[in-house]
């Protein structure tokens, strides 16, 4: 009788989670995700190799998030960060093909994230953007064909340690 009962539990399994609508949020931060609000400031950072970048982060729910332990895994999504100034794309590089990390502890509106990616800018000096409005954007495409985008209109501020 015990074997029959245990077999019934295994056959039933856990209920499937309810599907959620795919969503994305663009943010910043180098260790933890930091949300951005339209009209807010974002730091332009002078990197160790002489260039300038904005720290780019995102969090998502409802998409294939890939394998965060294997950057070469074909199931990983592709994310593209970009910055426009005066209608011109000033992004030198900002594309990543990698798995997203689960958000721990679980709960809230988001399931996975990536934090602190570099959106490298094609600018000669941070003075070019000091106090200027920029359009910061992200697009993520998963292997199931789901594409999500988010944008923020921000004010560029040179990092105080530049």
Residue ranges and their predicted role:
Residues 70-96:
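Extended low-complexity, serine/threonine- and proline-enriched intrinsically disordered segments
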Residues 146-162:
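Short beta-strand elements
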Residues 94-134:
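Short, solvent-exposed, Trp/other aromatic-anchored flexible loops in extracytoplasmic proteins
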Residues 1-7:
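Sec-dependent signal peptide recognition
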């Amino acid at each position: 009788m015990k074997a029959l009962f245990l077999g019934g539990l295994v056959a039933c399994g856990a209920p499937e989670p309810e599907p959620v609508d795919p969503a994305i949020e663009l943010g910043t931060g180098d260790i933890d995700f930091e949300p951005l609000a339209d009209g807010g400031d974002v730091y332009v950072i002078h990197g160790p190799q002489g260039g300038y970048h904005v720290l780019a982060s995102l969090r998502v729910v409802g998409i294939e998030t890939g394998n965060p332990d294997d950057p070469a895994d074909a199931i990983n999504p592709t994310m593209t960060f970009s910055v426009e100034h005066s209608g011109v794309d000033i992004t030198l590089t900002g594309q990543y093909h990698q798995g997203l990390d689960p958000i721990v502890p679980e709960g809230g509106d988001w399931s996975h994230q990536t934090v602190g990616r570099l959106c490298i800018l094609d600018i000669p000096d941070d003075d070019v953007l000091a106090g200027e409005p920029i359009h910061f954007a992200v697009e993520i495409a998963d292997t199931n064909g789901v594409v999500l985008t988010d944008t923020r209109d921000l004010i560029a501020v040179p990092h105080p340690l530049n």
